[in-house]
């Protein structure tokens, strides 16, 4: 779709990085469309970060899928998207956002604006949600 195959090859394992008590899962662009790839089995990670190039025609899917990944994986989700025009004349409006595990948008940048959005993520609040509503215990395990 975005000609990723010309520059990237499919991975065979997820990258989860421990950082100051957090486990962070790093994914790219098109991975957002595949929920099994981001499945948070046994709460392996707390923060899911997507770095992406989603053009304006797909901005509704971008927003909906980021929120869905936060809800289904009981984690924070940060989606970082580009702005401007690419060499194929596709226009990008940004739409970078951070969602809580409740699916609430907790930080964002206005469309068409480059910049940095900041917020405080609370690991304790995330762990309390997971203890109170442990849906991950009932989830099917998928192996890729």
Predicted regions and their residues:
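C-terminal/domain-edge helix-coil "capping" segments
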Residues: 133-144
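CN hydrolase (nitrilase-like) catalytic-core segments centered on the catalytic cysteine
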Residues: 33-116
